Amino acid sequence: MALISLRQLLDHAGEFGYGVPAFNVNNLEQIHAIMEAAEETDSPVILQASAGARKYAGEAYLRHMVLAAAETHPDIPIVLHQDHGSSPAVCQASIRSGFTSVMMDGSLREDMKTPSDYDYNVDVTRRVCEMAHAVGVSVEGELGCLGSLETGQAGEEDGVGAAGTLSHDMMLTDPAQARDFVARTGVDALAIAIGTSHGAYKFSRKPTGDILAIDRIREIHEQIPDTHLVMHGSSSVPQEWLEIIRQYGGDIKETYGVPVEEILRGIKTGVRKVNIDTDIRLAMTGAIRKSLAEDRSEFDPRKALLAAKKGARSVVKLRFEAFGCAGQASKIKPIAMEQLAQWYR
């Protein structure tokens, strides 16, 4: 199946009331794991590449691995999404490279560490929407800074994360401002700030309403019911994988992620895209540590990497099933990018 746009996939998810996990990918094993789980569950896929992933693997390598995935799994719709673009120029390069969706993160300045002002965010996001929509490519924007309501820290992943201590107002998207932002930019999807953060260390305890503002999602959705909402920093940090890592020599302190049941509350009130990275990293790291420890004479890295792929696949499958994605892939008929470009006009 040809690659599809984020807008088409999230429109389908909105119509049928499910959420789509968006998995960050860096290598072959991760893409294999995601596609195998998608095939098993008949789920559509969002494969997204951060700046760190593009630097690590090379954009051309990532693009061709995703094209290979589309060729190998012709019945699975795939969105190729650029995560956290730092400027219109970065987004333009990704569009030219074949990405079907880009994120312009104007909540931060181009250094991806300095919080921006509202007018800057509107300006750069609007410019990307005009450019992307002209060729049928979808755009995700961000309003508010990702950060922990518990600590005031943004967390950092692949070089993205506001520096310093943030105020609660900065870390919570304002619903009325969200309405204005969407009207002025034309984004297809909006990443919102509700107290989640990048990385494994999100919360020091199982999150409750004082540090995870799930109820804010409903307030935002009521203001922009036709714009798809996105949760970033939404790995659940499975405790079983933390225990395996520790059991086989890892040193990870106590930490908690976003519970799946809280994500499901978000999906019921307008969240359609859920970004997940850390969960796959934990599963792969735990599986590799276990594999190497159980056979110390093994020197073929493929054995450990196969174990890593199996671990990642188990996490991905659980998310597809939990979010209501399973069984949806075969219902989606691709819309050509040229046709979408006409629709945007």
UniProtKB/Swiss-Prot annotation:
It catalyses: beta-D-fructose 1,6-bisphosphate = D-glyceraldehyde 3-phosphate + dihydroxyacetone phosphate. Gene3D superfamilies: Aldolase class I. InterPro entries: Aldolase_TIM, Class_II_FBP_aldolase, FBA_II, Fruct_bisP_Calv. Pfam families: F_bP_aldolase. Binds 2 Zn(2+) ions per subunit. One is catalytic and the other provides a structural contribution. SUPFAM superfamilies: Aldolase (SSF51569). Its EC number is 4.1.2.13. The active site is at D83. Dihydroxyacetone phosphate binds at G199, G233, S234, S235, N275, I276, D277, T278. D-glyceraldehyde 3-phosphate binds at S50. Transmembrane segments: none annotated. The keyword Manganese does not apply. Keywords: Calvin cycle, Glycolysis, Lyase, Metal-binding, Plasmid, Zinc. CDD domains: TBP_aldolase_IIB (cd00947). Belongs to the class II fructose-bisphosphate aldolase family. This is Fructose-bisphosphate aldolase, plasmid. The lineage of its organism: Bacteria, Pseudomonadati, Pseudomonadota, Betaproteobacteria, Burkholderiales.
